[in-house]
Amino acid sequence: MTTRRLMLVHAHPDDESLTTGGTIARYAAEGADVQLVTCTLGEEGEVIGDRWAQLAVDQADQLGGYRIGELSTALRHLGVDGPTFLGGAGRWRDSGMADTTPLHPRAFAGADLNEAVGALTALIDEHRPHVVVTYDPFGGYGHPDHIQAHTVTTAAVEKASWQVAKLYWTVIATSALETGLASITQLPPGCQPAPLDLIPTFADEKISAAIDVSGHREAKVAALRAHATQLTVSDDGSSMALSNLIALPIADIEHFVLVRGEPGVDTGWESDLFAGVEL
């Protein structure tokens, strides 16, 4: 039987665990070949707490190297080898948010598209994934690197000699966020639940797939905890927050929108990203 192959393209260390950690853990545990491609080292991230605060970009500027270690630990919890960085570790730099200082010369948001697309195309042709996952055109919440990851991934899937059967966007379903916020039993210290209107979501009718990752919750929570410079997880593992102290639920179901390929079900949501794929 042919091994199922999944590739996920994320912008920074921690993104893989935030939106797709359960999916990664589930398919890895099921024996699929799961490849994570991370586009930057996350050098511009806001550091939580005092212990590693001086690694930040405005001080020692050593955060990117430290986050390689965090990502490596997270991937071990999720059962995946790695990490793999687009163009090699350090080729492209975290661009920061759109309203921050001018772009660094190596910022991923300003990357030469021919080079970036070529680098990802080569990885697609090497690993031959049946399914690829990345962000929607808005990058989930508008981060320039997420938007660039969407652009690069979409172009690379089209350019690759290997024909990717299905391309998905990782998204948050509106109803799932509502249910998840209501189910939070503990908040990280000093945090408040996210207002519904603050988090970009996709209406349920736009969702294509809902992946049940409840059986891999422990791995997902452990992976999130590994990104300790960026995330705070509640003691009971029901919620997490970035440096903005806005808490989100840690979901048992992860949602996706299919944008290339045919759905594996005639009606309703898929429960398997590989549904309908001929292996």
UniProtKB/Swiss-Prot annotation:
Family: Belongs to the MshB deacetylase family.
Protein purpose: Catalyzes the deacetylation of 1D-myo-inositol 2-acetamido-2-deoxy-alpha-D-glucopyranoside (GlcNAc-Ins) in the mycothiol biosynthesis pathway.
Comment on bound cofactor: Binds 1 zinc ion per subunit.
Full protein name: 1D-myo-inositol 2-acetamido-2-deoxy-alpha-D-glucopyranoside deacetylase
Record has Metal-binding as a keyword: yes
Catalyzed reactions: 1D-myo-inositol 2-acetamido-2-deoxy-alpha-D-glucopyranoside + H2O = 1D-myo-inositol 2-amino-2-deoxy-alpha-D-glucopyranoside + acetate
Co-factor requirement: Zn(2+)
InterPro entries: GlcNAc_PI_deacetylase-related, LmbE-like_dom_sf, Mycothiol_biosynthesis_MshB
GO molecular function, one term: zinc ion binding
Organism: Mycobacteroides abscessus (strain ATCC 19977 / DSM 44196 / CCUG 20993 / CIP 104536 / JCM 13569 / NCTC 13031 / TMC 1543 / L948)
